[in-house]
Amino acid sequence: IAGFIVLRLRGILGKRTGFEGKTPAQFENILKKVHQEKKTKQNENFDAVAQKEFLKGAKIAYETIITDFSDNDNKLIASKPLLSKKIFDEFNKALVERGQRGHFAEITFIGISSADIKEHKKLDKVLNVTVNFVSEIITCIRDKEKKIISGSPDKIKTIYDTWTFSRDISSNNPNWLLVDTLN
């Protein structure tokens, strides 16, 4: 009986031979449009779920950029993909100046106390999101002789930063760039 059922199903459904043909072009175009519309709607909606996901990434970016800026190799290797050209140039200039003075940073990132979206604006196809960060950092700047110029190697300092991230929502690139900083 089972063999009979299998043969009947095979006769009705057929078997795959590899020569079935492709989906008709008219359906491919419809599928592409549906996927594109869904993608566009997801990019344009910056709802509570999107904001929560954004803040997760923003916290990681914040810590990465702060610790990379404190690295004394003056390369900003980890941060470069997260920074707009303007911000990268500003940070790089500050690092070069610090190096020319013979100063080096000792920064220990303790953690982020809070990160809240202050505002988000869509301008054409670009979404800008401004975030208020409150973090705890131990920071100390030393000179060539290792004398402390500023900060303390033992004191945790509360830092208040306001950073603006930007992303072209029409792009397939999911990365956000840091485009502005205020302290």
Task: Please place each PLM-identified region on the residue numbering.
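Juxtamembrane and targeting peptides
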Residues: 1-64, 141-145
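A composition-biased, non-transmembrane "mature-region" signal
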Residues: 5, 14, 45-65, 69, ...
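Core segments of small alpha/beta cavity-forming domains
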Residues: 35-112, 116-118
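Structured, amphipathic secondary-structure segments that form assembly/contact surfaces
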Residues: 80-183
